[in-house]
């Protein structure tokens, strides 16, 4: 839909931690639709690198663009005062906390994925609004280290507590469940 780039940071300008950079000057524009009080909203773009539409799919094309021609990326993000873009998550994956707070599971997953022995993770919300982290351990690394299942469980619980210390109260992970294999990335036919 948009290629090859929307944003980047030239080497000589320096970067900002967590930022995707600035829109390509003179080529791309980025704005945030319906920002909340933190300035986070849907990232929309327009410019030379944006598609014109989906081939023979007028309904999909209509859904992909705003009425005034901006491409909906499906990302949630914000722009800082210097024009740097920060992606917070995906529109379809945002969760609502118990008091209506926005929870971006990708941000929590990024913290979990930096824990020792974690290959990948997925944060889900239960019916009671509690957050659960499904974690696929790096079993090759676990085996190489000689950890027992009990030691791995204990390590994951300690890591859950560490991650929670970095999160707001409404983002706390209640439980960690170990997953036996990598998560499916594409649907099977």
Locate predicted features.
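AMP-binding/adenylate-forming catalytic core of the ANL superfamily
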Residues: 47, 52-53, 76-167
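Short Gly/Ser/Thr- and Asp/Glu-enriched loop/turn motifs at secondary-structure junctions
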Residues: 1, 90, 126-130, 171-173, ...
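Active-site loops of AMP-binding adenylate-forming
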Residues: 1-17, 57-60, 139
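Conserved ATP-binding/catalytic segment of the ANL
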Residues: 22-27, 36-97
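Ser/Thr-glycine-rich phosphate-binding loops at phosphate-binding pockets of nucleotides
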Residues: 1-3, 73, 97-98, 186-188
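Conserved C-terminal "lid"/linker of ANL adenylate-forming enzymes
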Residues: 120-122, 160-188
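Conserved A3 ("GATE") glycine/threonine-rich loop of ANL adenylate-forming enzymes
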Residues: 1-11, 24-28, 128-130
């Amino acid at each position: 839909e948009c290629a090859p780039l929307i944003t980047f940071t030239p080497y000589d300008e320096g970067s900002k931690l967590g930022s995707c950079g600035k829109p390509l000057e003179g080529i791309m524009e980025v704005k945030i639709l319906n920002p909340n009080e933190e300035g986070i909203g849907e990232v929309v773009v327009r410019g030379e690198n944006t598609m014109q539409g989906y081939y023979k799919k007028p309904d999909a094309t209509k859904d992909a663009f705003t009425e005034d021609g901006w491409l909906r990326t499906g990302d949630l993000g914000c722009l800082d005062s210097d024009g740097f873009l920060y992606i917070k998550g995906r529109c379809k994956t945002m969760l609502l906390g118990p008091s209506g707070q926005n929870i971006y599971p990708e941000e929590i997953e990024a913290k979990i994925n930096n824990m020792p022995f974690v290959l990948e993770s997925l944060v889900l919300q239960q019916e009671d609004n509690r957050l659960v982290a499904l974690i696929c351990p790096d079993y090759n690394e676990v085996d190489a280290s000689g950890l027992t299942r009990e030691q791995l469980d204990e390590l994951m619980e300690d890591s859950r507590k560490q991650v929670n210390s970095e999160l707001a109260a409404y983002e706390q992970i209640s439980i960690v469940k170990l997953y036996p294999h990598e998560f499916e990335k594409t649907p099977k036919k």
